[in-house]
Amino acid sequence: MMTLNSLSPAESKAISFLDTSRFNPIPKLSGGFSLRRRNQGRGFGKGVKCSVKVQQQQQPPPAWPGRAVPEAPRQSWDGPKPISIVGSTGSIGTQTLDIVAENPDKFRVVALAAGSNVTLLADQVRRFKPALVAVRNESLINELKEALADLDYKLEIIPGEQGVIEVARHPEAVTVVTGIVGCAGLKPTVAAIEAGKDIALANKETLIAGGPFVLPLANKHNVKILPADSEHSAIFQCIQGLPEGALRKIILTASGGAFRDWPVEKLKEVKVADALKHPNWNMGKKITVDSATLFNKGLEVIEAHYLFGAEYDDIEIVIHPQSIIHSMIETQDSSVLAQLGWPDMRLPILYTMSWPDRVPCSEVTWPRLDLCKLGSLTFKKPDNVKYPSMDLAYAAGRAGGTMTGVLSAANEKAVEMFIDEKISYLDIFKVVELTCDKHRNELVTSPSLEEIVHYDLWAREYAANVQLSSGARPVHA
């Protein structure tokens, strides 16, 4: 973790790191790094009211454990920590299993759930030997059973959504890693919370769509929601030990995605292959496109609001091309705390699985960060014209209720249509905006789980058939 006093990343153009064994020290700043920022005469560190607001007679947000006083140990298992993985064949799931494979003395898998990749799921079962496995696509259940017919131990297999839910609330599991993309991850997460499982949350929609319902439920069951994505994990790490009321601002860093160096005028020429070329991260197609549009960051703003209780005015997005600083917080005394590391999703996943401990990692498979070799870190403000997703996300967040879920679902459908080449890249923003506009008259401020799911489905259907300003509709196969 790094601390920068009285520094706003949007005003700082670069941070440079020098190897003092090769260069002379920088005057006035010992420690081998220099800070350069534009507009030297401009004031910074303006007074911003405390961004942490906790309603009366309610507990702090679930992602605040360890903030002031560490909890007493409550280990209730013997041997390696038992975990369930919902979405085991996706990017989050496979990286979670990589961690388990490298740390068999720390973690063991008791249940796995996947969507449709039966071949990979069968391989995972053979390697990690869970007691329960589920495949969401019920039509593939016989294929899975055939693939595991010669298994040397008794395995329970449950098909469909109910199977995924049973994996999420498996009685042996202590922590459930939720890696399913979209609102499909909401019901399993709710089931895990009701069963008292701590949540390693990699499914943004759980809070973006379900925040008004999920957070009170987590408080009720004394469940910890531990963020497994890099940005919120960074914030979570920075707030450890932070007194209540000390948080002033959250600063989410963004790589800028595939088009950060493209002129706005060229965006009308974007092809699917262009959007899938992320400069820093190796991720799935949907999240890679979200990174290009910056919708991922807009959704993370909403998630940060729910996780950490920050007002939207006190959550800032900063473009940081190197993706070394994963996010920052500013405290009331104008200190800025940052979490740094190579862009590797295994790091935040591991932290959610091991918290409050830190698991030692091999330097071969987990390279250490060398700031002197890195050289410098740069920052810039995002362009609202290039990234209209930011305004859409902040507006949806401030509207609250079901609007955030509608935004997320409409974006998911729009990205799907873009990847299938049914709409253009710029149409993604139009589809989301028109869907949110249509929802304004039906907004539910305090939705039930059923209402959250209903408007998720409605938004997808509306987005799939929305008439664009050009008069065109999405092209269906």
Curated annotation (Swiss-Prot):
Pathway: Isoprenoid biosynthesis; isopentenyl diphosphate biosynthesis via DXP pathway; isopentenyl diphosphate from 1-deoxy-D-xylulose 5-phosphate: step 1/6. GO terms for cellular component: chloroplast stroma. Its EC number is 1.1.1.267. It catalyses: 2-C-methyl-D-erythritol 4-phosphate + NADP(+) = 1-deoxy-D-xylulose 5-phosphate + NADPH + H(+). Its cofactor is Mn(2+); Mg(2+). Mn(2+) binds at D229, E231, E300. It is found in: Plastid, Chloroplast stroma. GO terms for molecular function: 1-deoxy-D-xylulose-5-phosphate reductoisomerase activity; metal ion binding; NADPH binding. The keyword Repeat does not apply. Induction: Circadian-regulated with a peak in the late period of the light phase. NADPH binds at T89, G90, S91, I92, G115, N117, N203, E205, G284. Keywords: Chloroplast, Isoprene biosynthesis, Manganese, Metal-binding, NADP, Oxidoreductase, Plastid, Transit peptide. Pfam families: DXP_redisom_C, DXP_reductoisom, DXPR_C. It is an enzyme of class 1 (oxidoreductase). Transmembrane segments: none annotated. InterPro entries: DXP_reductoisomerase, DXP_reductoisomerase_C, DXP_reductoisomerase_N, DXPR_C, DXPR_C_sf, NAD(P)-bd_dom_sf. The keyword Plastid applies. Enzyme of the plastid non-mevalonate pathway for isoprenoid biosynthesis that catalyzes the NADPH-dependent rearrangement and reduction of 1-deoxy-D-xylulose-5-phosphate (DXP) to 2-C-methyl-D-erythritol 4-phosphate (MEP). Required for chloroplast development. Belongs to the DXR family. This is 1-deoxy-D-xylulose 5-phosphate reductoisomerase, chloroplastic. It comes from Arabidopsis thaliana (Mouse-ear cress). The gene is DXR.
